[in-house]
Swiss-Prot record:
PANTHER family: BETA1,4 MANNOSYLTRANSFERASE, CHITOBIOSYLDIPHOSPHODOLICHOL BETA-MANNOSYLTRANSFERASE. Participates in the formation of the lipid-linked precursor oligosaccharide for N-glycosylation. Involved in assembling the dolichol-pyrophosphate-GlcNAc(2)-Man(5) intermediate on the cytoplasmic surface of the ER. InterPro entries: ALG1-like, Glyco_trans_1, Glyco_trans_4-like_N. Its main location: endoplasmic reticulum. Belongs to the glycosyltransferase group 1 family. Gene3D superfamilies: Glycogen Phosphorylase B. It catalyses: an N,N'-diacetylchitobiosyl-diphospho-di-trans,poly-cis-dolichol + GDP-alpha-D-mannose = a beta-D-Man-(1->4)-beta-D-GlcNAc-(1->4)-alpha-D-GlcNAc-diphospho-di-trans,poly-cis-dolichol + GDP + H(+). It comes from Eremothecium gossypii (strain ATCC 10895 / CBS 109.51 / FGSC 9923 / NRRL Y-1056) (Yeast). This is Chitobiosyldiphosphodolichol beta-mannosyltransferase. The chain crosses the membrane at residues 32-52. Residues 53-126, 148-471 are cytoplasmic. SUPFAM superfamilies: UDP-Glycosyltransferase/glycogen phosphorylase.
Length: 471
């Protein structure tokens, strides 16, 4: 055997002997000593690498917020306004939601705003199994996306919908010490209650429990009305100091049309083809607009019924009543049904068009109209229709369906008119069209409303909650 072989054999023997000695020592050592050694070696690793990787992997020097909506970003104006305002305040913004329509161009071009699309949400169908499958898929997508977003200082979510987003984000908030802002537009359980017809339905009770329990884990709350804040304090037992009222206000894209430009605007390609022959706004013909989601809490038949009464009045009692052009914007589950009803009616004085507009064209349409109509009634009675704010931003007086909280936004015969039935809406139309003084007062006050802007409302609420301080 040569010298090198002897040396290798000796080294192996020494190694095995050392291993046996260490094994014997560990076998006789007390367990606390072993765990002390493990902690001594492992704790620095956990603190300096593993924990930051798990919870703060994407931490940035500037403040960072993830803004979530389980809806289409292109048609979620309040969420987009939040993104603009946080970006303007110097924050990094992660804007998360579905991309059915393109979001506003300024957000796409903003270097501080990163848009993160959730995989498309197909219709769940009516069966419980299909709904459960959709919730499971949404949960997987949200969890995966939140993993990528760990390190955010804040998460802001829109409610409703609350399932599955609210429980997931509430748990994530605890694990990562992210602060959670809950932006209340309405209550998910009241929306579901409208569909099933009663509060004591298992699904409604589950939805109520989710909102009641997990809302307590939020650090801050924003509501769209003072009535909603009172409800959260009295019924959900949330502390008033953590709740700020942030009224919806129109974005900067909603502006009144400068005087003298209406004729040229009506000739623009996006709208020109919808103007009927002989329709003359100079002669008093009137353009109305309504935006709807074609759901049960907005009975658009009230508007169509009012126009039918208007047609009858024009034929039987007052042939001088002007023509009406109505634009119906939006989409939803009952749209096809209403379109068929309109097609099957013989209209004489009224023309109705159903539109689905881009985020850029919708403000341009509002500028061309004389009055806006809102049929929103609110499943809770506590929220306000965003569409009316857009109308006010464009200088349009609004005819609104009356319900408890609407008085926080629309003062009857000041900046709009309120109604409860189709007959009352028809009377509002004739009153506003025929009475020059009323029309003038409504227009002047709507123009005053157009000066109330989103950023002032946002800055005031964020300062009250001490999230963003006013400079």
């Amino acid at each position: 055997m040569d010298t090198s072989s002897v040396t290798m054999h000796t080294e192996r023997a020494c190694c095995h002997q050392a291993q046996r000695a260490v094994a014997a020592m560990l076998d006789k050592a007390p367990s606390w000593l072993i765990w002390t050694a493990v902690l001594y070696v492992g704790l620095p690793f956990m603190l300096y690498w593993a924990v930051p990787y798990l919870f703060y992997h994407n931490k940035t020097k500037s403040r960072r917020i993830a803004i979530y909506v389980l809806g289409d970003l292109g048609h979620s104006p309040r969420i987009c306004y939040h993104a603009r305002s946080f970006s303007a305040a110097g924050w990094e913004v992660e804007l998360c939601g579905y991309l059915e329509e393109q979001p506003p161009k300024d957000l796409l071009d903003d270097p501080r705003v990163t848009i993160r699309a959730l995989p498309g949400a197909s219709n769940a169908g009516k069966s419980l199994g299909q709904t459960a499958r959709k919730v499971v898929l949404q949960t997987c997508h949200i969890v995966r996306q939140l993993w990528e977003l760990r390190g955010c200082d804040y998460i802001l979510i829109q409610n409703p919908p609350s399932i599955p987003l609210l429980p997931i984000v509430a748990i994530f908030k605890v694990l990562t010490r992210t602060r959670l802002i809950l932006d209340w537009h309405n209550f998910a359980y009241t929306v579901l209650q409208l569909r099933v017809g009663r509060f004591l339905h298992p699904l409604v009770l589950v939805s109520y429990a989710v909102e009641f329990l997990f809302s307590r884990m939020a650090d801050y709350h924003i509501t769209v009305t003072a009535a909603m804040k009172d409800y959260l304090v009295q019924s959900f037992l949330l502390p008033a100091r953590r709740i700020a009222v942030m009224y919806d206000r129109p974005g900067e894209q909603f502006r009144p049309l400068p005087a003298g430009e209406r004729g040229a605007a009506l000739a623009e390609p996006f709208i020109r083809g919808y103007i009927p022959a002989g329709f003359d706004v100079q002669r008093g013909d009137t353009i109305l607009v309504t935006s709807t989601s074609f759901t049960l809490d907005e009975d658009i038949n009230v508007l169509f019924g009012a126009l039918k009464i208007y047609e009858s009045a024009a034929a039987k009692f007052d042939t001088t009543l002007p023509r009406i052009l109505l634009f119906v914007t939006g989409k939803g589950p009952l749209k096809g049904k209403y379109m068929e009803e309109v097609r099957n009616y013989k209209w004489e004085r009224c023309t109705i068009h159903f539109l689905w507009l881009s985020a850029e064209d919708y403000p341009r349409l509002l500028q061309l109209c004389d009055f806006g109509v809102s049929l929103h009634t609110s499943t809770s009675g506590l929220d306000l229709p965003m569409k009316v704010l857009d109308m006010f931003g464009s200088g349009l007086p609004a005819f609104v369906m009356d319900y408890p909280a609407i008085g926080e936004l629309v003062q009857d015969r000041v900046n709009g008119l309120r109604f409860t039935t189709r007959r009352e809406l028809e009377q509002c139309l004739i009153f506003a069209i025929k009475d020059e003084h009323t029309r003038k007062v409504l227009k002047e006050n709507a123009l005053l409303e157009s000066k109330n802007r989103w950023h002032q409302s946002w800055a005031s609420a964020m300062s009250e909650l001490q999230v963003v301080r006013q400079s």
